Design a protein with these regions (language model features):
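Alpha-helical cap/lid subdomain in secreted, periplasmic
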Residues: 4-6, 11-16, 56-72, 85-240
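Short glycine-rich His-centered loop
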Residues: 10-48
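Glycine-rich beta-strand-to-loop/alpha-helix junction loops that act as flexible
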Residues: 25-28, 79, 106-108
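Short beta->alpha junction loops
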Residues: 74-82
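Short catalytic helix/loop segments, enriched in acidic residues and glycine
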Residues: 40-62
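Short, electropositive, low-hydrophobicity segments enriched in small/polar residues
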Residues: 30-36, 81-85, 111
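Conserved long hydrophobic alpha-helices within structured protein cores
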Residues: 20-32, 49-55, 132, 136-144
Length: 240
């Protein structure tokens, strides 16, 4: 990717060239959400920790490889966010920062629209890609993690358990599968590289791994350790 050339140039002459800026546009996983709980008002809430989001680990890896290069990360993740919202806030949250690379990751919330929502999802992704590609920024589509395939016994709170049951159906009925495939089709039509971590999670499931245990909230937020899989996969693509 062109980003590598910028990293090399800055590393070779860090006093005369700019650092690099990577923007990550997505949902709660991008924002840095982990465990969920019911607060004192009876509302669902989540624990936030940006330092353990995938882009934090990516920045750490790049800083290890290019210690003289400032790596600026724009966290444009939004809990509960969908691609439509991402398209609407693209300029405000991403493009005005003039990023060198934009990583786009949606689908976990979008799939709540069922198969009937696929066309709208695809159109929102097109709006996002159109906006990015009008600039000098490169773009990567990052496919999401699997959601829970069962309701874990640790989910004792009725409201959270009910959410887990709904999400499980979207995963096991192939709804999220369909959204991931549609996203890949749209990205491929634009010639946008695809970092297919969803396929890697699928391989883990096929290998007998209980992927529900790899989710911090046992629903849809990966553990910090699994966010490192996103980071390592993105690093491999960036360096390719």
């Amino acid at each position: 990717m062109k980003l590598v050339e910028k990293l090399k140039a800055k590393y070779a002459s860090f006093q005369t060239t700019e650092g690099v800026t990577i923007a990550c546009l997505g949902d709660s996983v991008t924002q840095g959400c982990f465990e969920c709980y019911i607060d004192g008002n009876g509302n669902g809430n989540t624990i936030f920790d940006q330092s353990k989001a995938y882009h934090a680990y990516l920045r750490e890896m790049l800083a290890t490889l290019y210690p003289a290069v400032p790596i600026n990360i724009i966290n444009a993740g939004l809990s509960g966010g969908r691609a439509l919202q991402g398209a609407e806030r693209l300029e405000r949250d991403v493009l005005r920062h003039s990023p060198d690379l934009v990583i786009v990751c949606f689908g976990l919330n979008d799939c709540g629209g069922g198969l009937a929502g696929l066309d709208g999802y695809a159109e929102s992704l097109r709006r996002i890609f159109d906006g990015i590609l009008k600039t000098d920024a490169e773009c990567i589509l990052l496919t999401p993690n699997l959601m829970n395939t069962r309701v874990d016994r640790s989910l004792a709170e009725p409201k959270i358990k009910e959410i887990a049951e709904q999400i499980m159906k979207r995963q096991n009925d192939g709804i999220l599968d369909a959204y991931v495939e549609r996203a890949k089709e749209v990205a491929a039509a634009y010639g946008i590289p695809i970092c297919d971590c969803y396929a890697k999670w699928k391989k883990l499931a096929d290998a007998g791994v209980d992927t529900t245990l790899l989710l911090a909230n046992r629903i849809n937020h990966p553990t910090p350790e699994m966010n490192k899989l996103f980071a390592a996969s993105l690093l491999e693509m960036i360096l390719d």
